[in-house]
Amino acid sequence: MIPQISQSPGVVQLVLNFLQELEQQGFTGDTATSYADRLTMSTDNSIYQLLPDAVVFPRSTADVALIARLAAQERYSSLIFTPRGGGTGTNGQALNQGIIVDMSRHMNRIIEINPEEGWVRVEAGVIKDQLNQYLKPFGYFFAPELSTSNRATLGGMINTDASGQGSLVYGKTSDHVLGVRAVLLGGDILDTQPLPVELAETLGKSNTTIGRIYNTVYQRCRQQRQLIIDNFPKLNRFLTGYDLRHVFNDEMTEFDLTRILTGSEGTLAFITEARLDITPLPKVRRLVNVKYDSFDSALRNAPFMVEARALSVETVDSKVLNLAREDIVWHSVSELITDVPDKEMLGLNIVEFAGDDEALIDERVNALCVRLDELIASHQAGVIGWQMCRELAGVERIYAMRKKAVGLLGNAKGAAKPIPFAEDTCVPPEHLADYIAEFRALLDSHGLSYGMFGHVDAGVLHVRPALDMCDPQQEILMKQISDDVVALTAKYGGLLWGEHGKGFRAEYSPAFFGEELFAELRKVKAAFDPHNRLNPGKICPPEGLDAPMMKVDAVKRGTFDRQIPIAVRQQWRGAMECNGNGLCFNFDARSPMCPSMKITQNRIHSPKGRATLVREWLRLLADRGVDPLKLEQELPESGVSLRTLIARTRNSWHANKDEYDFSHEVKEAMSGCLACKACSTQCPIKIDVPEFRSRFLQLYHTRYLRPLRDHLVATVESYAPLMARAPKTFNFFINQPLVRKLSEKHIGMVDLPLLSVPSLQQQMVGHRSANMTLEQLEALNAEQKARTVLVVQDPFTSYYDAQVVADFVRLVEKLGFQPVLLPFSPNGKAQHIKGFLNRFAKTAKKTADFLNRMAKLGMPMVGVDPALVLCYRDEYKLALGEERGEFNVLLANEWLASALESQPVATVSGESWYFFGHCTEVTALPGAPAQWAAIFARFGAKLENVSVGCCGMAGTYGHEAKNHENSLGIYELSWHQAMQRLPRNRCLATGYSCRSQVKRVEGTGVRHPVQALLEIIK
């Protein structure tokens, strides 16, 4: 039995008083003080961990102003505040103690657009890709690019002055910010825009907080103008935080306070809105993927690409390429980056040309390609091949791979992981190759592996050395390397921070600004935040205050993780290896990961949030001397003793009386998971929440009773076959209003599905497929076996959507094969989802033995529901290991593709069909939609894939009363719109859950693709 974890870091009374008064004064946002909420805000995409005291989620600038006004009261003068955006920073920019002000949950509105003048006004929580999706119909985009664009907020981009691919042409974020609305500590609203110097000077004479700010920035930047110009490196990725260089324009006629706020990392004010310059979308885009025999060759050849007037040149090394090859993302780009025969590709330059004049762009591209052919022929520059991509879809797939490369590095095998700490150094591009040679020599001298990729055209290369932060000696080495890289970048006239902000690295600022200019930064900080209450420890302390700076060797996640025994870390690596990349925060409703995060906007309910909580739970167990691996081994094989039952009952009674146990917070996070398994493939680190969720639930319920619904769900495969003998009787009973009311109130289940009428057995009476014995199958000759298909039943389709199985049997017959309906054998997936892992292992072993016996017949076995079929491949393998055996159950599309391989494609005509894939299917098998389309094409039918996210049903998730609202909300995110615009009778869904959800919400259901094929084939 796990212990009660009754202690967690408390919240100081002053913080609680502040939050209470904040709500009393009309704050309309959310506040959070639970340990789980604070833990999710204690990390970002960096190696650091710092627990805040509380989190607030404002809904408007007025809410932020209320926070700032109340904070200015003397009684709260000791509280500190840190603005936070998407939480994707790689250097801990938004990590701090005190109160986190999260702008991402609610402040995500696009306020207005002026296409004629080319600008848009947004709130700080708008995500970069969200904005570009909105701008696309207007023919515009927000140009600064970054790898986390589908979850990074514009407020975060402004605060770090982010930039990435294309910066040589498009510049940094600050080059596109026309003005901001910022709230100062005290509640004053500061609106910035470029002003004539005379007006700025006049504003500086005002005896107000804003006047003091204008005066300080104006006077310091004017008086130190020459020093600033001399000290700021002449780089595309210029020095920011604070950008003293660009406050005045070159002619000294214009003053723009915006430039001080961009890159300020929340140390000066709360940026709540911004007016942004938007760029016309280029009409023509071409990509040339240039392949090299070494990474050094790729680096040294990059200036040649820039000279060819390319928009951007992105470089990727062999380590990153090889990790991409092992990831699901490679499926989408493999044809665009093929291997060169008899050559090893060890470097890649992704070269983009873009513009409005197609003839001019093609002329430049062709000139480059001619020159590349010459280099290949003469064996020069290490070029071994190239491929051109002319289609926009292909260009976007290549960049999606490049973006995912950031996270893929974290999936490297072993305890040492490539980590960010000196990854965005910037040097003059002409020195980059030599600089990187020295950088590599430095890392090689310590015997470290590393991955490299980046924006070689701008002199920025992302370098992530592999270190084990659970090893104190390697943590010390990380600081040593940081110091060495500072010296190395200075040697080449570069910067330590080219695009990702300073964060915990701000201690190195004097080395780049110089002591005299660093003192000027402190004066600016003092004008905005004299008492150092906004994100203290970052950028610089205010003048006149001897306040400490954050350090590179501050507390890291590894400091906490190393408290967990190595064996536990290894066995629970699905949670331990989360590096915080945050891809699970992807805003796109059509992205399958993560539906619970999308509908709640609560990061507790994301793979990252759940992994964070489980890591802390394991640490707290270790702190109490509890070994979860030993507990798992000691779990009883069957039943529980009366003594244990009494103890669980007592513990559950106390839990219902709100007795605290951190395990309850973890349980709450796990309960929101749909177990769709999208994270197990879509996450670059392959964080498999359903797997460690099941293990947690199993251990949690050693202390607490399980709800009745869990037992009902886990035994559905036992009682469904019994009820199916009299389906009308069961359906009549379950349809009674009183029964439904009791089910919702006392069991917690709603909209229970009805059994199929007639049942599958009734439909198959007398059919040969249901009447063949094992002996008859074994007696078939080789030719007969080659034409026989074994249909594997699953509990949901066979008993609740039996027509699909019956139609598949008929389809197999229609194609000239002999279908045989195998006896139903429980799959066990429902047991796995609910954490009945011992019971699941028994079920899996019994069914695996049966299917292995069938596999020896040498006939294909086929199932129709993707989630259940894939359970045989994934969960069975984890539960049984080698005892699983070698059996293979094919999905319907896999078998059809093989069976129809020799059949030519017919002329495609007629109205389209529309394919809705199951989450588990399309994430684990990304080629499934195309495979289905190819099958339909063989019969002259067109099948179009519909890009949607999760339907919200996910097995029994949508039937649980506590999930009902979220289940319907998830459906609304993408499925409902698609169903409304497409003819329902042409929509097809492979998942039973998906079809069930459509019928529940829309009133009429959709069919399985095999049913459409049965109709199509004459």
Which residues does each predicted region cover?
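N-terminal flexible segment immediately upstream of the FAD-binding catalytic core
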Residues: 1-72, 76, 86-118, 147, ...
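N-terminal glycine-rich flavin-associated loop
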Residues: 46-77, 81, 99, 103-148, ...
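Iron-sulfur cluster-binding electron-transfer modules in prokaryotic oxidoreductases
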Residues: 529, 536, 690-1018
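Mobile "lid/hinge" segments at catalytic clefts and subdomain interfaces of large enzymes
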Residues: 157-159, 163-250, 254-325, 330, ...
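Terminal amphipathic helices with adjacent charged low-complexity linkers/tails
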Residues: 274, 308-415, 454, 599-600, ...
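Ferredoxin-type iron-sulfur electron-transfer modules in oxidoreductases and energy-metabolism complexes
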Residues: 550-581, 585-723, 841-847, 885, ...
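Flexible inter-domain linker/hinge segments
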Residues: 3-5, 203-248, 254, 524, ...
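A glycine-rich phosphate-binding loop feature that marks nucleotide/adenosyl-phosphate handling sites
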Residues: 88-90, 148-155, 239-247, 314-331, ...
